[in-house]
Amino acid sequence: MSWQAYVDDHLMCDIEGHEDHRLTAAAIVGHDGSVWAQSATFPQFKPEEMNGIMTDFNEPGHLAPTGLHLGGTKYMVIQGEAGAVIRGKKGSGGITIKKTGQALVFGIYKEPVTPGQCNMVVERLGDYLLEQGL
């Protein structure tokens, strides 16, 4: 399966059978910042934004004072799983990032998708990739 198929079929899919419940954007990005696959709506990000995200995985709490920035959008960092998951909130939407051995799985959402639904979709694919040694 291509990386694009993982994004299209496992991240940008209907959530829990609701056609109107989909992530607004998603991507799989290598630890080096190279995009493996992304939705058409995934924001252009700056290298320093990706560096900040990677630093937070290695040094949990790094982004808390400044917020998580992606594509120029600032998210307030909320409780995640140290070294494994970063979660951010902005208004009625947010972001979930799951770290695997070689990649970061991104999901961005807004209402009617809930934070829990975004977490489920992103972390399910991330856990699968971890099981595959990726």
From Swiss-Prot:
RNA-binding is among the record's keywords: no
Listed name of the protein: Profilin-4
Residues found modified as Phosphothreonine: T114
GO cellular component: cell cortex; cytoskeleton
Signal peptide: none
Additional observations: The variability of the residues taking part of IgE-binding epitopes might be responsible of the difference in cross-reactivity among olive pollen cultivars, and between distantly related pollen species, leading to a variable range of allergy reactions among atopic patients.
Keywords: Actin-binding, Allergen, Cytoplasm, Cytoskeleton, Disulfide bond, Phosphoprotein
Origin species: Olea europaea (Common olive)
Segments carrying motif Involved in PIP2 interaction: 84-100
Major site of localization recorded for this protein: cytoplasm
Chain's role: Binds to actin and affects the structure of the cytoskeleton. At high concentrations, profilin prevents the polymerization of actin, whereas it enhances it at low concentrations.
Family classification: Belongs to the profilin family.
Pfam families (alphabetical): Profilin
InterPro entries on file: PFN (IPR048278), PFN_euk (IPR005455), PFN_sf (IPR036140), Profilin_CS (IPR027310)
Disulphide bridges, residue numbers: C13-C118
Molecular function GO labels: actin monomer binding
Subcellular location: Cytoplasm, Cytoskeleton
Post-translational modification: Phosphorylated by MAP kinases.
Organism lineage string: Eukaryota, Viridiplantae, Streptophyta, Embryophyta, Tracheophyta
Oligomeric and partner information: Occurs in many kinds of cells as a complex with monomeric actin in a 1:1 ratio.
